């Protein structure tokens, strides 16, 4: 093969697989037409595939296989996508293919693998594609040996560390490190700025935190610069204007603060996204004159003023314009109406001083989506005789103070998505809505609707896929759902009676939320093939059906706060996708579900307030399984026995800190149609005695355990110190004995620690006093002795946190220790405050009035994730449904 033929770009790989049959053998192992591949190369390839489970290869990419050099017979191109399961080892036979030019191993299941340094031996590589494999750890320094490399894609892994060493990769054209856990600063001396051939750079969704070096301006060949969702701060360097070849510039979701960046020289710019920063000032008039600009996103900044649109801008190419959540004046509307090629427009939360008239958009004949949420809308413009572009497919009018159903929707025959939640509409939903021929997604939550007009048949036979009616005034029996329904949510209404069996006839149903109603009777045994099931806070009875895990698609099950009995279904062992399981506050009587350790993705297990009994240690007294578990909440049951010292050693996910995990969120999304779909992000309301912490989104780096209110005994396992991601530990009200493990001082992220009402002895480890985030500690009613550590976080606690230990002394207790050396004046001040402190303690059971709980809740909601705080005495998990990502994944 000639040298020119070997210089393949990524797309060329597909072409070669299509036209060069004489050089291909595929992974179904029908070795036809393999004359060019030498026998020893075929044997080596077979040896490589034997290192993995290749059962997925039969249904994988049809272009999978290898391609050999016609002159040497050596493997030159290897593509195995969505095919391999296992571990890519450092001594893999892959690294013996020294003639390889292109390797594509994207979307395999290589979890728990570090990125092998052996790749550095493949010095002829020109393209290396390793995205979506779950690789851990740092990029080996041996990668700098790949001096021929032109394309490197390591995106969608779990790689950590600072920016990898790429010095020597001077031929690199494409570098994609997005969706990893890289952190640290980008300094001007970084090897990144030696890559002068670079055309595509994507560092999005990492944890870099620094200013943007001016040396970005030296990468003159850059065409795509994507730095979204990091911690970049400060000003955008003026040298960015040197990148005159840029077609895409994404700086969104950072902490950048400056006036509008200098982009007027970027005459090739096609997409510009500066959303979710702190840019201020006005939009320069020159921006809208850029000849190729089609996508402009400036959401959630501090931009103000108006937008100047010259007469020539009526022929602007601008198709996407997102200006929501800024401080623009009302005059912005008229100039925008001149941008006649607009297809997607977001003007939400403009805070205009007058109602918006929808007629202003009548000139936008191509408009497909319009978001005016958070603005006052002229009631006259919502009537059926008003005008709005008939091309509209998506209309969002949340928080618009609308009190009557908009009849203008009757005219929108192209409408696919409608969200008019969080308004003041009441009465019944009009029958004509379900007659819109293309309607797929309807969100009417947080209004005052009481029912449906007309025949139920119209709704049943509609085209609706997603229907969300949360927080209204519906009551009575659940309506018959559309035959095509995929996601349905009616949380926080007053529905009664049993869940109808007709729901089982909706074969496409994937997500259902019936929480916070008054449903009675059993969970229908016919429910199956669902992904998200939220039934919490009803009056459901009977056992949890075995069929819920048919098809292994179940990802989240929350049946908390019902009257369920029986045992956990053993069929759950087949729920390979299950991440969240919550059965809090039921009457389930069972032993600890050790068998759930077979679930590879389980992150949250909450069994609180049931009738579970017996040991929670495996029969062999070894470590507990659950490598991905982060929230483990089993309080107020009847668990007994002791825990071995190595109990926690397999909890790999809880051992990784935020810096290692990058602070990613627990997110799930599914796209249903062109502009979006449904999804959810898991929100966390973590409240322990003395600590209240709210997160609208639950970071995957958080971990919490609660064993309180059981009959556990023996020593606290020393291995608890391995769980560096722990922010909350509650083992109170048990019979633990022995010393507090010294290893707990390693829990540097710990914010709440409750070990009260046990039989612990010895001293409080001094290391606990140096945990900087520890906002609450309670070791009362044990048998502890000695001086209380005098770290800042300890001495600030209430004295009730240490009472009931006859041998304890030192602040904040009034019993002083001999030789503490505390200043007499300090002791006097403490005595002066005693009476006041005692009165305060009578009024508050927890520090600063913060209650004990980890809140769990659920709600299907298409649109933005809205954090909902549900306070109770013990930990719960708050799961929210979000959806419609109109731009791209966050």
Curated annotation (Swiss-Prot):
Cytoplasmic side: 872-890
Cleaved signal peptide residues: 1-22
Biological process per Gene Ontology, one example term: response to molecule of fungal origin
Designated name of the protein: Receptor like protein 23
One Pfam match: LRR_1
Side Extracellular, residues: 23-850
Record carries keyword Coiled coil: no
Topology term for the membrane: Single-pass type I membrane protein
Transmembrane parts of this sequence: 851-871
InterPro entries cross-referenced by the UniProt entry: Leu-rich_rpt, Leu-rich_rpt_typical-subtyp, LRR_dom_sf, LRR_R13L4/SHOC2-like, RLP23-like
Alphabetized PROSITE patterns for the sequence: LRR
LRR repeat placement: 97-121, 123-145, 146-171, 173-195, 196-218, 220-243, 244-268, 270-290, 291-316, 318-339, 340-363, 364-389, 391-411, 412-436, 438-461, 462-485, 487-506, 507-527, 528-551, 553-575, 577-598, 599-623, 626-650, 699-724, 726-747, 748-771, 773-796
Induction conditions: By mannitol.
Similarity comment: family membership: Belongs to the RLP family.
């Amino acid at each position: 093969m000639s040298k020119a033929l070997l210089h393949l770009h990524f797309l060329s790989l597909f072409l070669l697989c299509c036209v060069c049959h004489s050089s291909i053998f595929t992974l179904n192992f029908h070795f036809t037409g393999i004359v060019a591949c030498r026998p020893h190369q075929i044997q080596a390839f077979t040896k490589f595939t034997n290192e993995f489970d290749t059962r997925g290869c039969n249904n994988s990419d049809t272009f999978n296989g290898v391609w050999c050099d016609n002159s040497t017979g050596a493997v030159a191109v290897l593509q195995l996508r969505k095919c391999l399961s296992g571990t890519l080892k450092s001594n893999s036979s892959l690294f013996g293919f020294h003639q390889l030019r292109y390797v594509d191993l994207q979307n395999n299941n290589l979890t728990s693998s570090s990125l092998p340094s052996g790749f550095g031996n493949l010095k002829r590589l020109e393209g290396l594609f390793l995205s979506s494999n779950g690789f851990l750890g740092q990029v080996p320094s041996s990668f700098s040996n790949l001096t021929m490399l032109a394309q490197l894609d390591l995106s969608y892994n779990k790689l950590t560390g600072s920016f990898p060493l790429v010095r020597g990769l001077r031929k690199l054209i494409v570098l994609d490190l997005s969706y990893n856990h890289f952190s640290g600063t980008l300094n001007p001396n970084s090897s990144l700025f030696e890559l002068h051939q670079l055309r595509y750079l994507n560092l999005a969704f990492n944890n870099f935190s620094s200013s943007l070096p001016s040396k970005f301006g030296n990468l003159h060949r850059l065409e795509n610069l994507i730095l979204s969702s990091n911690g970049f701060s400060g000003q955008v360097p003026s040298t960015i204007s040197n990148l005159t070849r840029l077609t895409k510039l994404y700086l969104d979701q950072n902490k950048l603060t400056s006036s509008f960046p200098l982009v007027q020289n970027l005459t090739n710019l096609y997409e510009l996204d500066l959303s979710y920063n702190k840019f201020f000032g006005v939009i320069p008039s020159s921006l809208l004159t850029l000849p190729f600009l089609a996508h402009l996103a400036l959401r959630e900044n501090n931009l103000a003023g108006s937008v100047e649109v010259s007469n020539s801008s009526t022929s602007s190419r601008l198709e996407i314009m997102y200006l929501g959540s800024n401080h623009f004046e009302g005059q912005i509307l008229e100039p925008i109406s001149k941008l006649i090629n607009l297809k997607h427009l977001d003007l939400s939360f403009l805070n205009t001083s007058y109602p918006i008239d929808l007629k202003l958009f009548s000139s936008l004949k191509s408009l497909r989506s319009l978001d005016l949420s958070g603005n006052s809308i002229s009631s006259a413009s919502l009537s059926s005789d008003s005008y709005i572009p008939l091309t509209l497919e998506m209309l969002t009018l949340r928080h618009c103070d609308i009190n009557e159903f908009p009849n203008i929707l009757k005219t929108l025959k192209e409408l696919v998505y409608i969200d008019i939640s969080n308004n003041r509409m009441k009465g019944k939903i009009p029958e004509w809505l379900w007659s819109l021929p293309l309607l797929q997604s309807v969100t009417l939550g947080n209004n005052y609707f009481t029912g449906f007009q007309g025949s139920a048949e119209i709704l049943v036979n509609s085209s609706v896929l997603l229907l969300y009616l949360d927080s209204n005034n519906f009551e009575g029996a659940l309506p018959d759902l559309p035959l095509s329904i995929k996601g349905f949510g009616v949380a926080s209404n007053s529905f009664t009676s049993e869940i109808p069996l007709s729901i089982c006839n909706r074969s496409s149903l994937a997500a259902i939320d019936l929480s916070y109603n008054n449903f009675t009777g059993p969970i229908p045994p016919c429910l199956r093939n669902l992904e998200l099931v939220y039934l919490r806070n009803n009056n459901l009875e009977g056992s949890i059906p075995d069929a819920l895990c048919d098809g292994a698609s179940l990802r989240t099950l929350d049946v908390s706060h019902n009257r369920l009995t029986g045992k956990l279904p053993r069929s759950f062992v087949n729920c390979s996708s299950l991440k969240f399981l919550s059965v809090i506050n039921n009457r389930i009587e069972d032993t600890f579900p050790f068998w759930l350790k077979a679930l590879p993705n389980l992150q949250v297990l909450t069994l609180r307030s049931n009738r579970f009994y017996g040991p929670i240690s495996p029969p062999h007294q070894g470590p507990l399984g659950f490598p991905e578990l982060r929230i483990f909440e089993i309080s107020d049951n009847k668990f007994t026995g002791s825990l071995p010292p190595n109990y926690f050693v397999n909890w790999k996910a809880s051992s990784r800190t935020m810096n290692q995990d990058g602070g990613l969120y627990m997110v799930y999304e599914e796209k249903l149609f062109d502009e979006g779909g449904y999804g959810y992000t898991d929100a966390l309301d973590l409240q322990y005695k003395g600590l209240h912490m709210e997160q609208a989104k639950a970071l995957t780096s958080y971990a919490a355990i609660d064993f309180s209110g059981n009959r556990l005994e023996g020593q606290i396992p020393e291995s608890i110190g391995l769980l560096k991601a722990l922010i909350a530990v509650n083992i109170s009200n048990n019979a633990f004995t022995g010393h507090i493990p010294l290893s707990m001082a390693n829990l540097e992220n710990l914010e709440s620690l409750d070990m009260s009402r046990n039989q612990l002895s010895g001293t409080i480890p001094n290391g606990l006093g140096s945990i900087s985030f520890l906002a609450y500690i309670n070791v009362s009613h044990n048998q502890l002795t000695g001086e209380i550590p005098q770290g800042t976080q300890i001495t600030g606690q209430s004295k009730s946190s240490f009472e009931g230990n006859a041998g304890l002394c030192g602040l904040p207790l009034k019993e002083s220790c001999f030789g503490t050396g505390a200043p007499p004046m300090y002791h006097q001040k403490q005595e002066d405050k005693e009476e006041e402190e005692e009165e305060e303690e009578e009024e508050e059971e927890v520090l600063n009035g913060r209650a004990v709980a980890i809140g769990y809740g659920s709600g299907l909601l298409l649109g933005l994730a809205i954090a909902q705080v549900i306070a109770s005495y013990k930990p719960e998990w708050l799961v929210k449904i979000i959806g419609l990502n109109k731009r791209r994944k966050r």
